[in-house]
Amino acid sequence: IGMIRYGSQHLTGRDLEFLKDLPVSMTVQNDGMPDLMMCHGSPRNLSEKILPGHVENKEIFADVAPKYILCGHTHRVANFTQYGKTVWNSGSVGCPLNGKSKAEFMILHSKDKQWEVEFVTLDYDVEAVIKEMREKSFYETAPFWTQVSEQLLRGGTVAHGTALNRAMELCQMKYGECKWPMIPEECWEQACAEIFTEK
């Protein structure tokens, strides 16, 4: 709930309209180059993951015309071909799940009317980012999301999804039901305490 609260405090009505109007996926065309399908999760769902080797990819790719798919959501670099599609995931600039405290991105180069992908990792001032998170009151607004983010920035490997899943399990056990994003902070707190104690 905390990051939703933070977002609602900082996004304008115009920002929200812009986000609402964005398509789930879009095809990008460049003269003389193969088309690119761009999406956050998958071409059909913002929250769906495209993972190497998953049989579900056959169904995900069924209605996708372009050969190349650029996606994100997993916070992990990916470069694979399956069911006639090549998938590139740039990883994450802010919270990569690489355990290395490095920003990740990719550059697409055109060469002989084909795409060549270059994956890049860069060092950056992680402590400055964490300091800014504290200055902007992230710990007050979204303490447990921020706790997970900080350990990722410092090279940890516990994903937000891991904490979210455990918090939802605890919410379900305590209240009989759990609907995202309405997860009580006490469940987040217990989930993070368990996860980081195990580490």
How would you name each of these model-derived features?
Residues 44-46, 70-81, 95-100:
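Active-site environment of divalent metal-dependent phosphoester hydrolases
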Residues 39, 68-75, 87-91:
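Active-site neighborhood of phospho(di)ester-bond hydrolases with catalytic His/Asp-centered motifs
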Residues 25-28, 77-81, 104-108:
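Short beta-strand scaffold segments in enzyme catalytic cores
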Residues 22-25, 74, 92-95:
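Glycine-rich, charged/polar anion/phosphate-binding loops
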Residues 29, 39, 118-120:
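Beta-strand residues in well-ordered beta-sheet regions across diverse protein folds
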Residues 83-90, 94-199:
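Acidic, His/Gly-rich catalytic cores of divalent-metal-dependent hydrolytic chemistry
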Residues 1-28, 33-35, 45, 51-65:
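Active-site neighborhood of divalent metal-dependent phosphoester bond hydrolases
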Residues 67-68, 116:
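Short active-site oxyanion
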